[in-house]
């Protein structure tokens, strides 16, 4: 997904599993240390904004890194028109606005983002996300609220499904996720949250004829509901979350959905998101990045639309090479590696090669029996040299002719 937007601030929520889509500047999230280069080194670099200024012969003052201006005043950007693309949505028109401020000079920037998206497939997405920091970053409050009308594909359960099994599920949904984290040590946080997900007007559209679908076997109902507290752990040593060149990231979310909170039946889930970034070679600006994303149903039976699935992570980035929703099951394990390298010395152009593998448990045995690999390559175009935000254009391949274009603002992980 991509948002063509030149604003400085967006927000990235790390609140839990994701079944409600988001089409905004997701990966170009607010960084906890926005100043990623000195003015001298930044001005040696080139980005899209520099090129546009040169083309229009801009006489505006020399650009500054607005991310280092620590003001308590709320700065608002927008509304701004934009455009996006994903395999699930096709092209999309977007209107977005965001704001930022510093609660204290010694705190990370607090940010808010909202948008309205209408897609070529008649889908509607309206998120509101916020990330607030207190003095000395002692507390972090994360909010992720969304409304969607999002008809999209499902292919059934497990790893043996085929592309011909696919059909549309029509639904509307809201999610109300929020969490409060407290600093335990440098770069380490833990806290508690509350997540509510509600789906309604769920219906199958032109399912395979003369066949009982996996959704019907699993339990097709016109509504799905999940409510529960979350227990969160976060460890993040990256200096730049938009385009990391080193460090580690670990995010663990345990979510018990108990009947006392209105669930039809109790079920529990666990998400473990781990990433590592290594400069390779060490003296270069090239980066070797690894990502592990495991999404497990510990016990009980999750609603069908809230089960682990391809592209079901918070920013719909797992499984490049396959359409989101291509595989689905009670448990998912995922691993990806990517090599990111410069093409031009001025940083304007870069490239990547990547490979991933995902596996889902079979419904009948609850065992992992198949692996779906994905692989591909892509280009990077530097949009903002101060935050190192790239426009990412990747083409991914999967098994049995699967493939497509994957577009992001910022790195995939």
Model features per residue range: what roles?
Residues 1-20, 278:
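Bacterial Sec-dependent N-terminal signal peptides
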Residues 15-142, 219-245, 330, 343-350, ...:
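Outer-membrane beta-barrel initiation region
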Residues 17-20, 26-59, 65, 153-282, ...:
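Transmembrane beta-strand segments of outer-membrane beta-barrel domains in Gram-negative
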Residues 69-78, 83-225, 326, 389-392, ...:
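Gram-negative/organellar outer-membrane beta-barrel architecture
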Residues 77-79, 110-114, 139-143, 190-192, ...:
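Transmembrane beta-strands of outer-membrane beta-barrel proteins
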Residues 100-104, 117-123, 148-152, 199-201, ...:
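Sequence/structural signature of outer-membrane beta-barrel proteins
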Residues 159-163, 206-215, 268-271, 304-313, ...:
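Flexible, surface-exposed loop regions and adjacent strand-edge segments
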Residues 240-344, 349:
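C-terminal outer-membrane beta-barrel translocator/porin domains of Gram-negative envelope proteins
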């Amino acid at each position: 997904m991509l948002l063509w937007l030149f604003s400085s601030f967006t927000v990235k929520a790390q609140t839990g599993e994701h079944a409600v889509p988001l089409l905004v500047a997701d990966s170009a999230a607010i960084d906890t240390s926005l100043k990623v280069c000195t003015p001298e080194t930044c001005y040696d670099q080139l980005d899209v904004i520099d090129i546009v200024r040169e083309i229009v012969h801009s006489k505006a003052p020399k650009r500054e890194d607005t991310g280092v201006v620590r003001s308590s005043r709320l700065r608002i950007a927008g509304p701004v028109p934009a455009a996006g693309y994903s395999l699930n949505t096709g092209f999309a028109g977007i209107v977005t606005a965001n704001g930022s401020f510093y609660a204290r000079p010694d705190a990370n920037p607090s940010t808010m983002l909202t948008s309205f998206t209408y897609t070529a497939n008649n889908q509607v997405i309206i998120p509101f996300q916020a990330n607030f920091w207190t003095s000395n970053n002692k507390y972090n409050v994360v909010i992720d609220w969304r409304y969607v009308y999002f008809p999209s594909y499902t292919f059934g359960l497990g790893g043996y499904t085929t592309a011909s099994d696919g059909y549309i599920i029509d639904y509307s949904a809201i999610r109300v996720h929020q969490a409060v984290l407290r600093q335990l040590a440098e770069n380490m946080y833990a806290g508690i949250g509350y997540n509510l997900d509600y789906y309604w007007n769920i219906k199958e559209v032109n399912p395979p004829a003369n066949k009982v679908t996996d959704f019907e076997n699993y339990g097709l109902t016109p509504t799905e509901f999940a409510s529960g507290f979350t227990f969160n752990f976060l460890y993040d040593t990256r200096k730049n979350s938009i385009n990391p060149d080193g460090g580690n990231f670990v995010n663990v979310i345990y979510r018990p959905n108990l009947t006392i909170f209105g669930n039809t039946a109790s079920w529990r889930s666990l998400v473990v998101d781990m990433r590592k970034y290594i400069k390779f070679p060490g003296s270069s600006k090239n980066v070797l990045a690894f990502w592990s994303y495991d999404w497990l149903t510990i016990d009980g039976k999750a609603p069908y639309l809230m089960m682990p699935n391809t592209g079901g992570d918070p920013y719909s980035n797992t499984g490049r090479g396959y359409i989101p929703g291509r595989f689905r099951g009670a448990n998912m394990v995922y691993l990806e590696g990517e090599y990111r390298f410069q093409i031009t010395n001025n940083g304007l152009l870069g490239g990547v090669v990547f490979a991933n593998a995902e596996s889902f448990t079979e419904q009948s045995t609850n065992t992992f029996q198949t692996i779906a690999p994905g692989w591909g390559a892509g280009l990077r175009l530097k949009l903002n040299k101060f935050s190192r935000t790239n426009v990412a254009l990747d083409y991914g391949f999967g098994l049995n002719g699967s493939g497509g274009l994957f577009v992001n603002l910022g790195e995939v992980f």
